[in-house]
């Protein structure tokens, strides 16, 4: 291929890829499967490698990341990125509306049209485009200066690297980066329990600060635009600018409305208070802006916020209930967590009977007692939390919560490490709760995926003394299992079969399954690449470990401490005897493709070459996930013999159906 041919093909591929990016992220109308899209991207990247002079910063290939930024440069915003003043009641909204009316009357302006739009619960950023090409992305920072995070911004597919319409000179686009609920849950599922993010906004903020843009690219984030500055025609009103942003390739969320009266504003606010829970992302309020942009400058701003806009914040979903008891749970790494047992109450569409109290300090801060009436809140967090007590309603028989000094499971004196807020049980080898926690983690779907090994059975195995660590699982025999409650011959056979199948799980999944503190799925993969055998990893010191991407001194120390324990070395010996994968297989780690990255697959009918478990393993190893029911979000339905009703449903929903042969070809 000549450089001229390559240039033409590269231009075609870039245009096609950006079109499909826009359809997927902005219109939610994908025309290609993830596999087909990835093939286009692979072709583009191959051509750019072959003809490096044709690589440009606005190429879609630059979204995959790979840049390591040791320190983000500080940049000054062209105009301050002010935060909006918040309101929390209809009365405050009316005060704002009347205040603007008064200011406009002073300017001899009598048309007061407002725009109401949903407030995304994300992280504000500024994008600078020069002659239509993205040249900088920066955080809000203190409003005057922010961090230049351009390498991370380039990885977000809903941000165009080149505007869809030609614009000369410089224009600035501002908006919010956020994470969809589904992507947030998937990210948390792959993190150690103690390092999970509380909500999508925290996950977004933490991701944008990462120094490795390749890791940012792996975490699916989105962008919604709400501000455009630098157009030649500055007379456009706010709604017209939102339309212009959409024409330039951005999504604006689509949920905004012109409002000419305070009644119309209140209608929009009330309408979305309930509807927002059905959205695939978090929204915590409504932003109100004067539609006439020319008046923004005339109305001006205070030191902190503009006078022409305000944010109405929905109250967090709260409910009143009674705290009946507090139990202290012991996690798999020994963390003691107080959990409130509550009178069941309906909150945000579900019945809540338990709520976290986080730690002992939180109990003291809340001054909460047994039998107190409390307010619980659900505001994007993983589980509800107690936010305050109602002391005026305290019953006469309310009594203090007995804070334990010893482990509620094994009676070992608790310890509180320096610089930590939680108390721990140090008896990790013999504490039944910690053993149960490690077994359940080992058997979980993202780890060894041992079907049938649930809470009830694990509790019996530990109570009967049959299992002391995960290595003992592979010594279990059918007759032992048949004697357990609700474990007949068939269930025992199924569990033994599931344990046998787990012996083939990849080395990186085994590393995650070991439950080393601070080692999630992503870190386990990096370790498997850096140390191809478990023996090599066990011999590594902190300095060598810290050289691995995304592993700092804390994680390195945790790994060294884990393998320094005699019990850990004994466990490795058991796993070796059980014939588990203690080394990286070239097919599973080194050379495995990622053809199913981000895809959800469903199997139906009988497969000729694989069991369902084997097929699912192949999908997960290649970046995909296997679902149990079909929906519009399903990427592919793999149809074996006698596919049944799922085939009909797939055709109705427009889900792509492939044969087992096509499935093999994709691998």
Curated annotation (Swiss-Prot):
One of its GO terms (biological process) is DNA replication. It catalyses: NAD(+) + (deoxyribonucleotide)n-3'-hydroxyl + 5'-phospho-(deoxyribonucleotide)m = (deoxyribonucleotide)n+m + AMP + beta-nicotinamide D-nucleotide. Residues 591-667 form the BRCT domain. The active site is at residue 119. GO terms for molecular function: DNA binding; DNA ligase (NAD+) activity; metal ion binding. PROSITE patterns: BRCT, DNA_LIGASE_N1. Belongs to the NAD-dependent DNA ligase family. LigA subfamily. DNA ligase that catalyzes the formation of phosphodiester linkages between 5'-phosphoryl and 3'-hydroxyl groups in double-stranded DNA using NAD as a coenzyme and as the energy source for the reaction. It is essential for DNA replication and repair of damaged DNA. NCBIfam families: dnlj (TIGR00575), PRK07956.1 (NF005932). This is DNA ligase.
